Every structure is written in C-alpha cells, then in structure tokens.
C-alpha cells in the first residue's frame, strides 16, 4: 500500500447491534476495494477481521479490528467493532479512533439496543453517522419499515441516500438518490449505473 497524506486517510468505525452484519459488510468492502482475493464469511470462520479463535468459535467479534483499503486515492481504515455487550469496550475504542461511524442495522430487526449505543457513542464524540440497512437479501427484511423505525428513533434528520428498488420482496437494484442513478447488483459486484 502506498503512503498517503493525512488529508487522504479516513478512519471509519463500523458499529451496531450484534448480528447486524458489521464484519460481513467490512469484508464486502475489503473484497470490493481489492484488499482481498476472496470474500470472507463469518459463518465459515475465514474473515480477515475476525481471526481470533474465540471470534471464529462465537461467529462474532470480541475486539475491535482494523483493515485498511484503498479507494479513489484515499486510504480508508475500517474499524470493525464488537456488537456484543460483553465486549462493549471495543465499540468505544473503535469510535474514539474514528472520523465517522457507519452503523449497520438489520433489515429484519431494525433499531436495537446496540444501534442506540452506537449512535450515542458517535454523538458523544460529535462524529458523522451513516446508517446501513443490511441483510436485504432475506425475504423477511423490510427496508422501508426499518427506515421509518430509524426516523422515529433518531429524528427527521435521518434521510435516505441510497435505497433499494424492491421487486417481489427482493432488492432488484439500488438507487442513489443524489446521483439519480440505479445500480444492478450481482452478489457483491456492482454494475455501472443505468438510467431507470
């Protein structure tokens, strides 16, 4: 990895409730950015970020772990934080080192206690937050219900930037509302934008 000026380095904590897909999202980002030749899976115990034997056994993070990726002339340090309350100190460590916090929210469960703790930790440090509604491939996931749940919990400043286009209960593509572009997804690979 090349050397970067401080202005081109971002530290992003990935936080949220246990089981909301923090490590899986981080692994997808690492893979998409070319930081790994394979997509690590928590269920298979082969992720870059959960490499401790206890984490592999639990299928859950117990410490904050960092992985750097390169994207558009920036170095982004992803800080994967634990969601289990027994290891809550890892959440605060990760948020303390971060410039912003990406908060994963389950598309099935919505806002949970871990979501609230992540928001409170980010707010205490005055950090920017972005919510990522995860697990939308599951047919019981409901993006718009979770979005309304987020607004009810954290106020009207919660606004969508990228939303799924749902067909027959499945996310068919994603629409970037700022760019007015739709992106078709095939597993982890994102195609070029198409006009819809």
Task: Name every feature range the model reports, one short phrase each.
Residues 1-105:
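P-loop NTPase switch module centered on the Walker A-proximal segment
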Residues 65, 81, 132-134, 179:
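A secondary-structure boundary/capping signal
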Residues 84-85, 97-116, 123, 127-141:
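Conserved Switch II/interswitch segment of TRAFAC-class P-loop GTPases
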Residues 139-187:
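Canonical P-loop GTPase G-domain recognition
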Residues 9, 74, 97-100, 124-129, ...:
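Short glycine-/polar-rich loops that comprise or flank the Walker A/P-loop
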Residues 186-196:
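Residue-level detector of conserved catalytic or cofactor/ligand-binding positions
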Residues 24, 28-29, 90-93, 97, ...:
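Alpha-helical scaffold elements adjacent to nucleotide-binding pockets in ATP/GTP-utilizing enzyme cores
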